[in-house]
Amino acid sequence: MASVIPASNRSMRSDRNTYVGKRFVHVKNPYLDLMDEDILYHLDLGTKTHNLPAMFGDVKFVCVGGSPNRMKAFALFMHKELGFEEAEEDIKDICAGTDRYCMYKTGPVLAISHGMGIPSISIMLHELIKLLHHARCCDVTIIRIGTSGGIGIAPGTVVITDIAVDSFFKPRFEQVILDNIVTRSTELDKELSEELFNCSKEIPNFPTLVGHTMCTYDFYEGQGRLDGALCSFSREKKLDYLKRAFKAGVRNIEMESTVFAAMCGLCGLKAAVVCVTLLDRLDCDQINLPHDVLVEYQQRPQLLISNFIRRRLGLCD
């Protein structure tokens, strides 16, 4: 696909957002070099069956989100925002041979679904990072966009994560590897979060803040909900926990950010998490927004990332 940047604008700027740095994606596995073929099973791709550099070598922005339909909608939205003339029907699911994830590409933007929870996004990230490595991509920015529950903030607020924390409000991801617990850092790229926050200021009526995001292993008891099939705590215990989370700097809760931050950081990817809140967990546990309001809220992270990408590519007025 042709460059989205007009020929007259293709000289890159000399500020910190330039692509000239050639920051490649690193895999931390010496055994990959010994393999004749790498099959990315859950993506229905492979190093012998596909020309990954030709297919993905120009990727600069990767956006991941839980819902397949939402990621398809984001890809179609970016296709229009970047001014491509090809019909939307030309944007096909690259992972159509599998029912695990979906993947769409438009210009330098790759959109991929990751399902719900740490195990699902972890599998996708392993294969995505290897894909970017095999494709020899460089200077890639990866952003998770999604929905979340807020703590002490109004529904519809967009939270840009500075640090992902676990259920103990600690900036760490604990991975069980063989019979050991390995602890990894969950810090995200500070300059990227600041850049995204500055982009949000250009959008009217767009409440945004930077704060900690708590990542849990469960949607119900793990997030202190009283409405699951099981509940082993009181309303008072729930509120005490959420208030302590707020005091620790947590502004929203989801289920993927710690492993996302840890894996991207280890592999040299500049990463960010941008989630809209659908409710204030201090007030309620269930999402009861009108459908049109819910749809508009869900589009807010997409709108911010579109503005960010267009600005990076020099396409903003």
UniProtKB/Swiss-Prot annotation:
Regulation: A conditional disulfide bridge can form within the protein that dislocates a critical phosphate-coordinating arginine Arg-100 away from the active site, disabling the enzyme.
PROSITE patterns found in the cross-reference section: PNP_UDP_1 (PS01232)
The protein's enzyme class: transferase
Any one GO BP annotation for this protein: nucleoside metabolic process
Residues the record lists as binding uridine: 148-149, 223-225
InterPro entries: Nucleoside_phosphorylase_CS, Nucleoside_phosphorylase_d, Nucleoside_phosphorylase_sf, Uridine_phosphorylase_euk
Keywords per UniProt: Disulfide bond, Glycosyltransferase, Redox-active center, Transferase
EC number(s) reported in the record: 2.4.2.3
Pfam families: PNP_UDP_1 (PF01048)
UniProt catalytic activity: uridine + phosphate = alpha-D-ribose 1-phosphate + uracil; 2'-deoxyuridine + phosphate = 2-deoxy-alpha-D-ribose 1-phosphate + uracil
Disulfide bridges in this chain: 95-102
Expressed in which tissues: Predominantly expressed in kidney.
Cellular component, GO, one term: type III intermediate filament
Signal peptide, first to last residue: none
Stated family: Belongs to the PNP/UDP phosphorylase family.
Oligomeric and partner information: Homodimer.
Free-text function comment from the UniProt entry: Catalyzes the reversible phosphorylytic cleavage of uridine to uracil and ribose-1-phosphate which can then be utilized as carbon and energy sources or in the rescue of pyrimidine bases for nucleotide synthesis. Shows broad substrate specificity and can also accept deoxyuridine and other analogous compounds.
Stated name of the protein: Uridine phosphorylase 2
Native species: Homo sapiens (Human)
